[in-house]
């Protein structure tokens, strides 16, 4: 189903994708070899020899074309490794620096304590890093911030730098509070903010700023400071949750070393790299799957 324009998700679970791929492999007559470690790859006059190790012993596979579809480093518990990068380097292909992407951001100290207190709370937010902006859900967690907007911006964020978050992207909070002060001066500032934000979040923000009481008793300068905190919240992540939870790996085999039509290595005929092992990273919503399908298709046609 389509969540947002261009974003496609499984109706049930990712098992549907696995089942589809297995069915397609069986229909094409592909042989699946599980629990097999590739120990060596050699170039020959007619293609490649691939040496493997299994519980039953060692084996050698010969082929004219070899497609590396080993993925990146994300989610190591399912077997992610540097295998594809090592193969690329073995055959002289450049590999760009890699790091976790589409990944939750972590924080330390007082900010982390506040995130833990708000854990599970989600809001629509606009997250900005430089000129890159995403507006989607933001989720407070016991490690920091997550949700689609945070995952998206993590692919662009550089460690040590700050992000700007707008917790009410459709509302000028300073103008709202000043208007409420004029219209309903006896209203409590928490009540005014809780009309727009989850009350727990509004209370936490006001506590952080040491702001409380009736709007009539609060100077405009303090209302402006509150509005700034909500519309232009500056946060400085300490890092990410790493490959353990990253949906993709940023970086990989340099695209300039591959044919854009076939994904074949320009300097190694018969050797192809596809999917996440290549330095191509898409947004949330099936784009990385689509890259895997598309690059795999053209490589398969050419191999």
Please describe what each predicted stretch is.
Residues 84-91, 290-303:
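An active-site-proximal "capping" alpha-helix that borders the catalytic cofactor pocket
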Residues 55-65, 133-136:
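Core beta-strand elements of the Rossmann-like FAD/NAD(P) dinucleotide-binding domain
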Residues 93-99, 103-221:
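An anion/pyrophosphate-binding glycine-rich loop and adjacent beta-alpha core
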Residues 75-76, 104, 141, 145-148, ...:
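Glycine-rich phosphate/pyrophosphate-binding beta-alpha loops
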Residues 1-31, 36:
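Conserved N-terminal/central alpha/beta ligand/cofactor-binding core
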Residues 34-47:
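A conserved short coil-to-beta-strand element within the FAD-binding core of flavoproteins
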Residues 65-111:
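Glycine-rich loop(s) and the adjacent beta-strand/alpha-helix scaffold that form part
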Residues 34, 203-281:
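A glycine-rich dinucleotide-binding beta-alpha-beta segment and adjacent secondary-structure elements
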């Amino acid at each position: 189903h389509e969540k947002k324009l261009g974003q496609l998700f499984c109706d049930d679970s990712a098992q549907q994708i696995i089942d589809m791929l297995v069915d397609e492999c069986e229909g094409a007559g592909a042989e699946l070899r599980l629990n097999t470690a590739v120990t060596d790859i050699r170039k020959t006059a007619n293609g490649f020899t691939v040496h493997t190790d299994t519980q039953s012993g060692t084996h050698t596979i010969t082929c004219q074309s070899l497609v590396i579809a080993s993925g990146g480093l994300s989610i190591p518990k399912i077997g992610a490794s540097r295998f594809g990068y090592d193969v690329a380097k073995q055959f002289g292909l450049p590999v760009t620096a890699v790091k976790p992407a589409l990944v939750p951001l972590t924080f330390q100290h007082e900010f982390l304590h506040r995130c833990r207190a708000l854990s599970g709370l989600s809001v629509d937010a606009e997250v900005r890093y430089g000129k890159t902006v995403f507006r989607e859900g933001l989720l407070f967690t016991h490690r920091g911030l997550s949700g689609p907007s945070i995952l998206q911006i993590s692919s662009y964020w550089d460690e040590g730098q700050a992000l700007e978050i707008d917790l009410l992207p459709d509302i000028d909070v300073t103008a709202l509070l000043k208007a409420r002060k004029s219209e309903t001066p006896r209203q409590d500032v928490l009540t005014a903010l809780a009309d727009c934000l989850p009350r727990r979040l509004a209370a936490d923000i006001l506590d952080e700023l040491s702001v409380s009481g009736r709007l009539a008793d609060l100077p405009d300068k303090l209302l402006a400071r509150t509005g700034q905190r909500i519309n232009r919240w500056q946060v400085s992540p300490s890092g990410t949750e790493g490959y353990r939870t990253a949906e993709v790996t940023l970086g990989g085999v340099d695209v300039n070393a591959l044919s854009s039509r076939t994904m074949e290595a320009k300097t190694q005929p018969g050797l192809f790299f596809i999917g996440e092992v290549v330095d191509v990273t898409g947004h949330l919503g099936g784009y990385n799957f689509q890259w895997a399908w598309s690059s795999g298709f053209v490589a398969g046609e050419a191999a």
